[in-house]
Amino acid sequence: MFTEGDKFNQTVVETDLEQAVDVACRNAQDCCHSKSFTCFTRRMRAVSAARLPHVVLLAVFEYLNLKDLARCMRVCKHWLTVLQYPDSFVWRRLARTVIPDEALNDFSLLSEIPSFKDKLRAFCYAWNPNDSSKNNYLRPNGFTVHRNPVAQSTDSVRGKIGVNSGIHAWEFTWEGPLGTVACIGLATKHAALHCQGYVALLGSDDQSWGWNLVDNQLLHNSKPISPYPHINNPPKYQMGERIRMIVDCEQHSMYFEKGSEFLGIAFSRLPPLKLFPAMCAVYGNTEVSMVYIGPPLLG
């Protein structure tokens, strides 16, 4: 039986899983003829949900959505173990259901995300079409934002999920000309997403922190902080290059990497607020892809 802290509502379990359990039992019996499966042909209540065999749990989990699977992973160690394998058919089926085909078929876009479970997580952290300037739109792949050619306008977009704990990494790729302003960085939920003229909107107030890839300037509170990377004559960003942004909420800092090259600390003393990945652009028809790759490899 479950402990008090981990106890899963048995009534909910039986209600949610009863329709699927018959199918699961038949599939399990086709795979294995052990006597231990015969109890499922009678009544669900004869077996604790925490002791169901892996093959039965996988067959049942196949019918659940992402939110329910996340809850199941917190029920007990047995269920967590079943769902930990990142390329099981449960995650594969859900990924093919949730993530657009345009993204799954673009091997370059998700090349750093090998497993289906991590692809699902990346999609959950992608650009938010409902938290964007009206002059942007999200491409069908769900990971790439396109800025429409609107004159005298600076347009921004935030990611779906903000962070205020742990260490997180996103990868940005800028396709198309940069124009005079092309910033990537962080923003609170209060940061502006649109303004008139061509300005570095990301970093224009105390609610955002930006790196302008055009002139290699760090920006915050409407002030240029310093050139970045912190070297003489830093190289210009080349269209299509992948830039990784790492946010360390424990150290309240942010830094960037290009390939295996550490570019140095960009911002320190970040506030303990929920911060969202963001970008701002001014050039018409430019596109920016953002992929969440989880905690970075440290070493």
UniProtKB/Swiss-Prot annotation:
One of its GO terms (biological process) is proteasome-mediated ubiquitin-dependent protein catabolic process. Belongs to the FBXO45/Fsn family. It comes from Brugia malayi (Filarial nematode worm). Residues 105-297 form the B30.2/SPRY domain. Its main location: other. Component of a SCF (SKP1-CUL1-F-box protein) E3 ubiquitin ligase complex. Gene3D superfamilies: 1.20.1280.50, 2.60.120.920. Keywords: Synapse, Ubl conjugation pathway. GO terms for cellular component: neuromuscular junction; neuron projection; presynapse; SCF ubiquitin ligase complex. It holds the Pfam family F-box-like. It is found in: Synapse. CDD domains: SPRY_Fbox. Component of a SCF (SKP1-CUL1-F-box protein) E3 ubiquitin ligase complex which may regulate restriction and/or maturation of synapses. The keyword Lyase does not apply. One of its GO terms (molecular function) is protease binding. Residues 46-94 form the F-box domain. Pathway: Protein modification; protein ubiquitination. This is F-box/SPRY domain-containing protein 1.
